[in-house]
Amino acid sequence: MSFLCSENSYQQQSKISIDIDKSLKNHKLKLEEEIRVLIYGQKKVGVTTLFKTFLLMGESQITPEELMDNRNNVYKTIINQLKKFIIISNNSKIELENNNNIQMSNLILELDSENFLWNKEIGETCLKLWNDSGIQKIFQSQFSEFFGYFFKHLQRISDENYTPTPQDLNFIKLTQNGIIEGKFTFERCLIKMIEMGIQTSTLKKWINCFSEVQAIIYVIDLSVYDIVESEDCSKSINKLEKSLNGFKEIIESKYLHGCGVIVFFNKKDIFREKLKTVPFKTYDKDYIGENDFESTTNFIKNKLLDYYSNPNKNVYFLINEESEVDICRSTFNILKDIVLNITYNSVKN
C-alpha cells in the first residue's frame, strides 16, 4: 500500500499522535468507540469489491444464532430483488429471452415474499432468470454491483444445509435507497462501514443521512482516463473527470465537512498498462508532464487537492498495491489517525 500524500511529514504526524494520545488519556476518551466510515465512488470503480474486502478481513460481530435466524431473510432478499428486475422488464422495452423465462418471472411475482418456503426449484428458477440477458441488462445499467451478491451465491444458498455467513447478513441490510452497512472489528477497533450505492444524480437527496460519519473513503478508478460516457442524449463526460467531480461534490457537502478523507486509487495495474499505448493527454490535452505512473497520479492527486479547502484536515491517498490484509491495515491505521485528530480538536475546543 502506497501513501502518495499526507499534508504533514511523518515526523509531524508522530508528534501530533503523541499529543493526541495524552489528551485522550487526560479526558478518559477511548478509541474503542465506533468509527463510522462512508465508502463511495462512481459506478463500477470497485467500491463494492473493496467494501467486501474490509468485511472479510474484519472480525464479525454477528453470533451463530443470529446467522441462522436470518436464513429466511436471505431468501426473501433474493426474491424481492429479483422482483425489482422483473417489474422493470415488464414496464420497459427490455424483454426477457424467451416465453419460458417470462412464465418463470410471473411465478416469482406471484410469490408472497413474507410467507413462502424456499426450495431447490425456486433457487434454480432464480438462477435461470438471473442469467437471462434482459435481467442482466437491467442489472448492469440501473443497479449497483452489490445487488448481484446473492445471485452470484445462489448455488451455495440453495443447499439444504445452507447457513448464512456474516457477509450474507451484511448484504441483507441493503435498503431501497441503495445503502448497505457492515459492522466489524479490526485490531480491536469497532468499524461501522457504510457503502452508498446510489447514483450520483440522487446523491444530494441522501447525503444528509451521513452527517455522523467521521471519515470518507472515496474510490477512483485510474484506468478510465480515456473513456467517455453519455449521461443523457445531449451530454457526455470523461469517466475520470466524473469521478473527480463526484469527489468535489462529496467534500463540499456541509454534512461531511468535518470528515477526514481517504482517496483510494484503484485498478492501478490496468492504468499502468494502458499508459503504454494511450497517452494521458487523452484525458487532458493541456497535460505537459511525463506519461508515467508517478507523474500522472501526482497530477490527479493535485487536482483533487485543489478541490479540498479544509486546512485543518489531511487528505490521504492510497494505491491498491499489496495484499488484502495490508490494504485493510493501512486503511484502518489512517482511520484511527483521523478519529484521533477529530477527538483531539474537539478536546482543544
UniProtKB/Swiss-Prot annotation:
Asked if Transcription regulation is a keyword of the record, the answer is no
Start and end of every G-alpha domain? 33-349
User: GO CC terms for this protein?
Assistant: cytoplasm; heterotrimeric G-protein complex
Q: Which InterPro entries match?
A: Gprotein_alpha_su, GproteinA_insert, P-loop_NTPase
Region G2 motif: what ranges? 168-176
UniProt keyword annotation of GTP-binding present:
yes
Q: Where is this region: G1 motif?
A: 36-49
Region: G5 motif; residue ranges are 320-325
Which residues bind GTP per the record? Answer: E195, M196, G197, I198, Q199, N266, K267, K268, D269
Q: Name one GO biological process term.
A: adenylate cyclase-modulating G protein-coupled receptor signaling pathway
Any idea which UniProt keywords this protein has?
Answer: GTP-binding, Nucleotide-binding, Transducer
Q: Which GO terms describe its molecular function?
A: G protein-coupled receptor binding; G-protein beta/gamma-subunit complex binding; GTP binding; GTPase activity
Q: Where is this region: G3 motif?
A: 191-200
Q: Where is this region: G4 motif?
A: 262-269
State the PANTHER family in the record. Answer: GTP-BINDING PROTEIN ALPHA SUBUNIT, GUANINE NUCLEOTIDE-BINDING PROTEIN ALPHA-6 SUBUNIT-RELATED
Family under the similarity heading = Belongs to the G-alpha family.
Protein name per the record: Guanine nucleotide-binding protein-like alpha-10 subunit
What organism is the protein native to?
Dictyostelium discoideum
Lineage per the UniProt record = Eukaryota, Amoebozoa, Evosea, Eumycetozoa, Dictyostelia
